[in-house]
Amino acid sequence: MVPRRLFVLAVVVLADTAAVVNSGFADSNPIRPVTDRAASALESTVFAALGRTRDALRFARFAVRYGKSYESAAEVHKRFRIFSESLQLVRSTNRKGLSYRLGINRFADMSWEEFRATRLGAAQNCSATLTGNHRMRAAAVALPETKDWREDGIVSPVKNQGHCGSCWTFSTTGALEAAYTQATGKPISLSEQQLVDCGFAFNNFGCNGGLPSQAFEYIKYNGGLDTEESYPYQGVNGICKFKNENVGVKVLDSVNITLGAEDELKDAVGLVRPVSVAFEVITGFRLYKSGVYTSDHCGTTPMDVNHAVLAVGYGVEDGVPYWLIKNSWGADWGDEGYFKMEMGKNMCGVATCASYPIVA
């Protein structure tokens, strides 16, 4: 049995290093000696539980980098097993020469069941998009060959939903923040927590999921959405604390893309502004690193989609057309918080539940 003292030390070490998760092994980091000592202590703990192997060392460095905390030898073994399975998935997938690559990230020691329960929403029927109301532009209005709304300066920074299935709120605020900045030329950060706490009457369920189309309707009839500063994110369901004097944006209406109509979605993303979309996340996607994601195993129906995000552009990479999408799992996930999804096949239902707001 491994002495409890070592695991207590590991918890303390990890707590101290959580604030420097992105600088763990950078040569330019001025506090590298502290990080190195923390890594050394955790490595000793992991080796005591797992033995001195290359994979155990890799696991210890992963834990330090992402500020992990393991409270017992049993948990170290459990997380190491999941981490090893993730590592094998990354290696086997990347050997296939697909259009995308996986990589180890902060989710590598979480089981699929844990990840699904804390990062994804429950499937909901996107009935609003059965018949869309987006008006396609005239044929004389040419779509740009590629589009990236970040280059126009209207896309807000990537946020992190944490351990709450509130992706729909971040998709909603991302679309609203872009629309507001496009209209005013000023940046804004809006309250996801208000949507978590206050949107239940419009068939949204806080940390258990919701839909941007329903969130836009809530904001429209509520009279607005507060700013992030006045109503900060907590990542748990709470009591509604909306205050009219703190409203940052109002919604006049929302526009829905017809279910599965990628031509409408491309028209909206190319010529209007970023669009809230949803798709089905399946197990390997959580380890996405780069490239154009594609899958033969995800669904495309309204009851398949389980994660809401924001389409901010499109393009072509190595001959594969893609959607450029902003996620809400932090800027250290994927390609600086973004990913690319294959276009033209309604991949994983990306055009199944899409809508965008019209702001006051």
From Swiss-Prot:
Keyword entries, A-Z: Disulfide bond, Glycoprotein, Hydrolase, Protease, Signal, Thiol protease, Vacuole, Zymogen
Signal peptide: 1-19
Chief localisation class: other
Active site (UniProt): C167, H307, N327
EC number: 3.4.22.-
GO CC term, one of those recorded: lysosome
Annotated compartments: Vacuole
InterPro entries referenced in this protein's UniProt entry, alphabetically: Papain-like_cys_pep_sf, Pept_asp_AS, Pept_cys_AS, Pept_his_AS, Peptidase_C1A, Peptidase_C1A_C, Peptidase_C1A_papain-like, Prot_inhib_I29
Gene of this entry: CCP2
Name of the protein described by the UniProt record: Cysteine proteinase 2
Glycosylation sites: N125, N256
Pfam families: Inhibitor_I29, Peptidase_C1
A molecular-function term among this protein's GO annotations: cysteine-type endopeptidase activity
Entry-linked PROSITE patterns: THIOL_PROTEASE_ASN, THIOL_PROTEASE_CYS, THIOL_PROTEASE_HIS
Keyword flag Iron: no
Propeptide feature: residues: 20-142
Disulphide-bonded residues: C164-C207, C198-C240, C298-C348
Tissue occurrence: Expressed at the onset of germination.
Family: Belongs to the peptidase C1 family.
GO biological process: immune response; positive regulation of apoptotic signaling pathway; proteolysis involved in protein catabolic process
Keyword match Glycoprotein: yes
Coiled coil, from the record: none
Summary of the function given for this chain in its UniProt record: Involved in the degradation of the storage protein zein. May play a role in proteolysis during emergencies.
